[in-house]
Regions:
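Secondary-structure boundary motif
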Residues: 20, 24, 52-55, 108, ...
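Asp-based, Mg2+/Mn2+-dependent phosphohydrolase catalytic module
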Residues: 67-68, 75-156
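A short acidic, helix-capping loop that chelates divalent metal ions and anchors anionic groups
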Residues: 1-4, 70-72
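A mid-sequence interfacial segment
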Residues: 48-84
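A metal-dependent, Asp-based hydrolase signature
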Residues: 2-32
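Short, acidic loop-to-helix structural element flanking the phosphoryl-transfer center
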Residues: 30-61, 100
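A general structural signal for well-ordered alpha-helical segments in protein cores
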Residues: 11-15, 71, 103
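Generic structural signal for small/hydrophobic residues in well-ordered secondary structure
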Residues: 7-8, 53, 62, 87, ...
Length: 156
């Protein structure tokens, strides 16, 4: 089954399960499941930090477990994605964090040195994986602390 069909199957299965559990919310559930990507909002302070990092000369990359079409829709809607120099999207690459190969692919594709990379993620498993390929990592379960962490690492 290809990615799109698998994703649509999963979305239908989840939608059906939620509607079975909360039948009185069926219309709301269907609408949210159809438009969930539009409900995602960036953390404004973190967007400012991305701009600051670019001004300081840092290259910025994404490793994301986004579905490809969701990523593409989000990319069109959010102009701050242009701040990134490259992206590894799991659905496109058929790899998913914390598989070490996804981090290695980033390094290889963009000719990066692991010991010069800092990876930030909300999952400790993903941070451990990045460290296994030689990157430094910041575990950030609370995105509001990004500025504080970057200061502690003497980046800003």
């Amino acid at each position: 089954m290809d990615q799109t069909r698998r994703r649509n199957h999963h979305k239908r299965r989840v939608t059906k399960k939620l509607i079975n559990e909360y039948p009185e919310l069926a219309l709301d559930i269907e609408e949210i499941m159809e438009k969930w990507i539009e409900l995602l909002l960036p953390i404004e302070n973190n967007i400012k930090l991305l701009s600051l990092l670019k001004e300081k000369g840092y290259s910025l990359y994404i490793i994301s477990n986004f579905h490809l079409d969701a990523y593409n829709r989000f990319l069109k809607k959010q102009d701050w994605f242009t701040l990134f120099d490259g992206a590894i999207i799991s659905a496109k690459e058929k790899l998913i964090k914390p598989d070490l190969r996804i981090y290695e692919l980033l390094l290889e594709r963009y000719q990066l040195k692991a010991d010069e990379c800092l990876f930030i993620d909300d999952s400790l498993n993903n941070i451990n994986a990045c460290k296994n390929v030689g990157m430094d990592g910041i575990h950030l379960p609370d995105n509001s602390k990004l500025e504080e962490e970057l200061k502690e690492h003497h980046i800003i």
